[in-house]
């Protein structure tokens, strides 16, 4: 009998792979393995060397050595270890799920898979867990936006009895407070879950596929470890896309990460791009005191209803943000203190340059070709409504796959992946997915635009309500923007909403629920909405399909 200690086994699935390799060796009569005790007990006919056994195990990526411990003597192949130490049979083994990434989609999947009885290994190569949202995305950006909003209110509030004044601010202190809150949320929402859920474990390193059930993880110390799993989720997120502009990569340009955590305010910030992130950061920096110029390849929000981009551009220009539509940089240089951009609208100079032209999936380092996982032209992993790829047992969620790049979509996809991995059945329906851009006024959308509906041969009817007709907006002296509702003309059923309004994001979920429940605008107009609230604007806009709300008294139905 030979006793071996084995490092690297994390679940019964690992046991199965090691046992299969040892059973295949001629002369091995019986193999008993316990991953809890990290050891194997092997009975042979006496003609098998320890070196051969260790070699078979290490070929799978584990570390093995002969154990110095003692074990119960086995006198025949029919003997076995005590039942409490015996390895599980295939029928009752705990399923092992491996997850590449530790963002919102990854953790949502891990929690659901654990609830389904699985053991979960999360694999992360970055220095910190949590992914983009909590670390360098949603959370720090909303803190920055809120601080900038308060600065703007001090500088330019609408009330005649409140004196406007220049805010006294420290960018360094704002960043310090922002970083502290990021660390607090990362600890509460990610690290704490790892520490309190015994079904979850973390492996630090960068993963690549070896086959459909095996990942090779290159750890930070340079060693490699094989991770065998019954199911695998890819949740590797995305990275800022850098356009191929002559000279750009030779300059100290910012991505959103540098912009969010900067210690000083630039005098003049030029923003290449008109992505969601570009618009949010551009306005925040303007409100904190920087001169800001946006270079938009087309127009702002050109993929959305044209009225949204037109009105938001007007709001930006009113705040002093320079928006250059149909403008592209062809060359960028830096002289040590100033950037110079050559564009089709002339040369621009600035002391800081933000490049924010979108993000692309982190998939190129995964060795997806080894297993045949399908990606699209953008490198995004193609998944079905159950979040499964074309390879059975391999799933994907979040920015790395062909879905909208929103953290709540990633989390929903991760949850459904975890359910489907552990024997359940869950689909992700994005037909009423709300989206918000946290500019001020905010842009909020759900469902179809008129153009999208017409492309589907749906005849539409729509109404636009200016925010000056919403009592709460009037009371706030914040009447920029509008609410637009799109209906299927034949039925009056609401199929889309586009909103530009202060706190417009707080309105959009009500519209989403109305669309989800196939409500008509007549039914929506008949609902009770609290007075004075911004969301009452949905009711008022719905009423405009049948009457002129300017002729109604307050709260009139």
Swiss-Prot record:
Its cofactor is FAD. One of its GO terms (biological process) is detoxification of mercury ion. It comes from the Bacteria. Disulfide bonds join 133-138. Binds 1 FAD per subunit. Residues 1-65 form the HMA domain. GO terms for molecular function: flavin adenine dinucleotide binding; mercury (II) reductase (NADP+) activity; mercury ion binding; NAD(P)H dehydrogenase (quinone) activity; NADP binding; oxidoreductase activity, acting on a sulfur group of donors, NAD(P) as acceptor. Keywords: Disulfide bond, FAD, Flavoprotein, Mercuric resistance, Mercury, Metal-binding, NADP, Oxidoreductase, Plasmid, Redox-active center. It is an enzyme of class 1 (oxidoreductase). Its EC number is 1.16.1.1. Homodimer. The active site is a redox-active disulfide bond. Resistance to Hg(2+) in bacteria appears to be governed by a specialized system which includes mercuric reductase. MerA protein is responsible for volatilizing mercury as Hg(0). This is Mercuric reductase. It comes from Shewanella putrefaciens. The gene is merA.
């Amino acid at each position: 009998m030979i006793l071996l200690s084995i490092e690297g086994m994390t679940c019964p699935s690992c046991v199965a792979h090691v046992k299969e390799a040892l059973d295949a060796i001629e002369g091995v009569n019986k193999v008993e393995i316990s991953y809890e005790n990290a050891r194997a007990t092997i009975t042979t006919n006496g003609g098998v060397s320890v070196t051969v056994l260790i070699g078979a195990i290490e070929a799978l990526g584990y570390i093995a050595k002969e154990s110095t411990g003692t074990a119960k003597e086995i006198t025949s192949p029919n003997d076995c270890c005590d039942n409490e130490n015996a390895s599980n049979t295939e029928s009752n083994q705990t399923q092992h799920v491996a997850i590449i990434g530790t963002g919102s989609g990854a953790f949502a999947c891990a929690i659901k898979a654990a609830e389904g009885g699985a053991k979960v290994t999360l694999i992360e190569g970055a220095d910190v867990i949590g992914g983009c949202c909590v670390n360098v995305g949603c959370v720090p950006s909303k803190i920055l936006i809120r601080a900038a909003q308060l600065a703007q209110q001090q500088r330019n509030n609408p009330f005649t009895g409140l004196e406007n004044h220049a805010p006294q601010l420290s960018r360094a202190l704002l960043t310090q407070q922002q970083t502290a809150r990021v660390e607090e949320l990362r600890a509460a929402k990610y690290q704490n879950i790892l520490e309190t859920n015994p079904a979850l474990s973390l492996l630090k390193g960068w993963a690549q596929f070896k086959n459909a059930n095996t990942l090779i993880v290159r750890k930070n110390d340079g060693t490699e470890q094989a991770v065998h799993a019954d199911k695998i989720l890819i949740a590797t997120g995305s990275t800022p896309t850098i356009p191929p502009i002559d000279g750009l990569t030779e300059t100290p340009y910012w991505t959103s990460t540098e912009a969010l955590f900067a210690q000083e305010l630039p005098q003049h910030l030029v923003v290449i791009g008109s992505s969601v992130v570009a618009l949010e950061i551009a306005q925040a920096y303007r409100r904190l005191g920087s001169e800001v110029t946006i270079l938009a390849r087309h127009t702002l929000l050109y993929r959305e209803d044209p009225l949204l981009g037109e009105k938001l551009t007007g709001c930006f220009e009113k705040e002093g943000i320079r928006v250059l539509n149909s403008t592209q940089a062809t060359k960028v240089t830096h002289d040590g203190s100033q950037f110079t951009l050559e564009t089709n609208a002339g040369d621009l100079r600035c002391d800081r340059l933000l490049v924010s032209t979108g993000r692309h999936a982190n998939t190129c380092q995964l060795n997806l070709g080894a297993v045949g996982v399908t990606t699209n032209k953008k490198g995004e992993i193609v998944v079905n409504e159950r979040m499964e790829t074309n390879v059975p047992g391999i799933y994907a969620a979040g920015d790395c796959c062909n879905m909208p790049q929103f953290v709540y979509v990633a989390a929903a996809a991760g949850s459904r992946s975890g359910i489907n991995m552990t024997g359940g059945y869950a689909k992700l329906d994005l037909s009423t997915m709300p989206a918000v851009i946290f500019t001020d006024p905010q842009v909020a959308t759900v469902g179809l635009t008129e153009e999208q509906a017409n492309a589907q041969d749906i005849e539409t009817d729509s109404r636009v309500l200016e925010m000056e007709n919403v009592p709460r907006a009037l009371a706030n002296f914040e009447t920029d923007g509008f609410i637009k509702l799109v209906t299927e003309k034949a039925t009056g059923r609401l199929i889309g909403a586009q909103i530009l309004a202060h706190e417009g994001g707080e309105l959009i979920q009500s519209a989403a629920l109305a669309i989800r429940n196939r409500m008509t605008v007549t039914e929506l107009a008949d609902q009770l909405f609290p007075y004075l609230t911004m969301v009452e604007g949905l009711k008022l806009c719905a009423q405009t399909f049948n009457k002129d709300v300017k002729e109604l008294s307050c709260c009139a139905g």
